[in-house]
Design a protein with these regions (language model features):
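Short, glycine-/small- and polar/acidic-enriched structural segments
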Residues: 36, 40-163, 167-174
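Pocket-lining segment of extracytoplasmic ligand-binding domains
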Residues: 178-286
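Secondary-structure end/capping motifs
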Residues: 254, 259-334
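Long, low-complexity C-terminal extensions of enzymes
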Residues: 317-358
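Short helix-initiation/N-cap motifs at beta->coil->alpha
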Residues: 63-74, 127, 165-204, 343-353
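Short, positively charged and aromatic/hydrophobic N-terminal segments
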Residues: 9, 23-26
C-alpha cells in the first residue's frame, strides 16, 4: 500500500516496558554500578571491550556486535541493555514523539559521509542527482540515518524535489524489513512498503532505478550493472564538508532512561570513557613504529585527515558537531521522520551539554 500525503506510517513492533534496575556491585569496598553495553566492533572502542579503558564508578559487561542492525532492532524492541549504540534516525524520531525510553550522550561511534550510498542501475541513464526525479528509488527504511542525510543533501545542495520520486521500502538483500518508528510523511511524498521483496531484487529487475542505502545492494560488484551516482564520492564528500561543516553522525550512544534517572552521573563518566578510548585509538593510528592496521601509509593518511579536519578529526561532544546535529534536526523534520522540529538541547541531557576543560 502506498502511503498517503501526511499519513503516519506505523512500525511493526512497539517498545518494551521498563526493565530491571542496574546492579550495585562491590569492587574492593567501593560501590560500583554494573551496566551492560552493546556496541559494534570498532577500533575506537576496542580498549573498552578489553577492559583497558574504564569509567569511574561503573563496572561494564561489554557485548560486541558485528552489525548495527541487530543492536538497533533488539534495543528499540526490547531494551535489552543498559547502554547501547543506536541509530541517530531512530533516536531522534522516538524523542520527537516523547516516547524515547533512552537518553543520548554525544558519543558518535559511527560517522560516515554518504555520497557513496547512492547506487543506480548502469543502464538507467542517471548521471546527475536531478535525474532521480521521476524515478523509483529503493530505501531500506525511510528513517535509516544514512538515507536521511542523503535526502537532505539531495534536496538542499542538489535541488532535488523529493516529491517527484517514488520511494519503495524493502530490505537491502532480504525481504521482510520494516520501519522501526512511526513516520509522519510530508505532503506529496509517495512511499510504498514492499515486504515481499528486496532492494537488490527490484534493482536487478528494473523495478527501481536507484537505491539509497548504507549497505551496498547485492548487484554492486564493480561489473557496471550497478554503479555509484558519485563515482568519485570522496571528492564530492570533501566539497560538501568544506561548504557545510557537516560530518554525518550515523550512530550515537544511549542510556536506558530508567538507568539514567537513577544515576545521572554515569552520562559524563561514560562520555569520558569513550573519548579516552578514541584518543588512544588515534595515537595508535598515527604511530609509524609498526603497522597498527594492515594498510600502507595508514599513519600518513591519519595525519592528512587531521590536517583537514583539525586536531580531533572525529569529535565527540556537542559544540564541535553542532552544525551536523542542527542539519540532521532540519533534515529529519523536513522529511517527516520527526513529529516536531527538534533542537540540539532536546536530544541530550544537561549533564553532558558542557565539558569541563583544564
Amino acid at each position: 500500500m502506498t502511503a498517503r500525503a501526511g499519513h503516519v506510517q506505523k512500525p511493526t513492533h512497539g517498545l518494551a516496558p521498563e526493565l530491571r534496575s542496574p546492579t550495585i556491585v562491590d569492587t574492593g569496598g567501593v560501590a560500583s554500578v554494573h551496566l551492560t553495553l552493546a556496541v559494534c566492533d570498532y577500533e575506537h572502542v576496542r580498549e573498552i571491550a578489553q577492559g583497558l579503558v574504564r569509567a569511574d564508578g561503573i563496572t561494564l559487561t561489554p557485548l560486541i556486535f558485528p552489525s548495527i542492525e541487530e543492536i538497533t532492532f533488539r534495543f528499540t524492541k526490547s531494551l535489552e541493555w543498559d547502554v547501547s549504540e543506536l541509530s541517530f534516525g531512530k533516536y531522534i524520531s522516538l524523542t520527537s514523539q516523547g516516547i524515547a525510553p533512552m537518553v543520548a550522550i554525544p558519543v558518535f561511534p559511527s560517522r560516515v559521509h554518504r555520497h557513496s550510498a547512492i547506487y543506480v542501475r548502469g543502464e538507467a541513464g542517471i548521471r546527475t542527482a536531478k535525474d532521480l526525479e521521476g524515478r523509483a528509488v529503493g530505501i531500506p527504511e525511510w528513517a535509516q540515518t544514512a538515507g536521511i542525510y542523503v535526502r537532505g543533501f539531495l534536496a538542499e545542495e542538489e535541488g532535488v524535489d523529493l516529491a517527484k520520486i517514488r520511494w519503495l521500502q524493502a530490505g537491502v538483500n532480504e525481504p521482510g524489513r520494516a520501519e522501526k518508528v512511526e513516520l509522519k510523511l510530508p505532503a506529496g511524498i509517495r512511499y510504498q512498503p514492499r515486504p515481499d521483496t528486496s532492494l537488490s531484487a527490484m534493482l536487478a529487475s528494473g523495478e527501481v532505478d536507484a537505491v539509497i542505502s548504507a549497505r551496498a545492494p547485492a548487484g554492486f560488484a564493480g561489473g557496471g550493472e550497478v554503479v555509484r551516482l558519485y563515482p568519485n564520492y570522496r571528492a564530492a564528500e570533501e566539497r560538501f564538508f568544506r561548504k557545510t561543516g557537516i560530518f554525518p553522525i550515523m550512530h550515537l550512544m544511549t542510556i536506558r532512561r530508567t538507568v539514567f534517572e537513577q544515576h545521572p552521573w554515569i552520562a559524563m563518566n561514560l562520555f569520558k570513557m569513550f573519548d579516552e578510548a578514541k584518543r588512544r585509538c588515534f595515537n595508535r593510528l598515527r604511530d609509524f613504529t609498526c603497522a597498527r592496521i594492515p594498510l600502507p601509509w595508514a599513519a600518513a593518511m591519519a595525519d592528512e585527515i587531521a590536517a583537514g579536519y583539525g586536531p580531533d578529526p572525529y569529535p565527540y561532544g556537542i559544540e564541535q558537531s553542532r552544525a551536523t546535529i542542527e542539519a540532521f534536526c532540519r533534515y529529519a523534520h523536513d522529511q517527516g521522520v520527526t513529529h516536531r522540529r527538534m533542537t540540539v538541547d532536546d536530544l541530550f541531557p544537561p549533564e553532558v551539554r558542557a565539558l569541563a576543560r583544564v
